[in-house]
Curated annotation (Swiss-Prot):
Organism field: Mus musculus
Enzyme kind, highest EC tier: hydrolase
Gene Ontology MF term list: serine-type peptidase activity
Gene this protein is translated from: Mcpt3
UniProt record similarity statement: Belongs to the peptidase S1 family. Granzyme subfamily.
Domain of life assignment: Eukaryota
Keywords assigned: Hydrolase, Protease, Serine protease
Region span, Disordered: 1-21
The name this protein goes by in its record: Mast cell protease 3
General function of this protein: Thrombin inactivating protease. Displays chymotrypsin-like substrate specificity.
EC number in record: 3.4.21.-
Any single GO BP term: proteolysis
Domain Peptidase S1: from-to ranges: 1-21
Length: 21
């Protein structure tokens, strides 16, 4: 899941991770 935030750098890293999941 952490990789998701790196793949899609959003305004909110932790939030982006949840969205990627």
């Amino acid at each position: 899941i952490i990789g998701g935030v790196e793949s899609r750098p959003h305004s909110r890293p932790y939030m982006a991770t949840l969205e990627i999941t």
